[in-house]
A protein has these predicted regions:
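Extended alpha-helical solenoid/arm regions of large eukaryotic scaffolding proteins
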Residues: 1-138
């Protein structure tokens, strides 16, 4: 850790289940988790604090990182329904980063059956063939 003390899992649970914690403290803790790379924990604190600006920024970060699961979680929290184009962009990003499962799930959300099927074929290949650089979607 880079000097930020994060609460224990029990303290985190207590903070997230308390009605007596100030939103500014929750946001600060969320920022600390984010700085340490714990995005899911950051989401927990931002959601509790109803820090929608921070949640929107995290959604953009997750899209840029091709992270299907956190992006989907944030879309639910924000009551957002990403368009097929947004899901396709997430799928393309995930695919480019080698996150094949995330790519397939994003393409399925976009109803892009062709790309989802192509990624599924890649998932069936032995790992060495997936990462050799010679195989992939073009």
């Amino acid at each position: 850790m880079a000097g930020k003390k994060l609460p224990s899992c029990l303290k985190k649970r207590d903070l997230l289940n308390s009605d007596r914690v100030d939103n500014s403290e929750l946001i600060k803790l969320g920022q600390n988790y984010l700085q340490e790379g714990f995005i899911s924990d950051c989401i927990d604190f931002f959601e509790k604090a109803e820090h929608f600006e921070g949640l929107i920024q995290l959604k953009e970060k997750c899209a840029a990182e091709g992270d299907y699961f956190l992006y989907h979680r944030l879309a639910k929290i924000l009551r957002d329904s990403p368009s097929p184009e947004e899901w396709n962009q997430l799928g393309d990003k995930a695919l480019g980063l080698g996150k094949l499962l995330f790519a397939r799930l994003a393409y399925e959300r976009a109803d892009n059956h062709e790309k989802a099927a192509q990624v599924e074929k890649l998932l069936q290949l032995p790992l060495e063939e997936r990462t050799s650089g010679g195989k992939g979607l073009h």
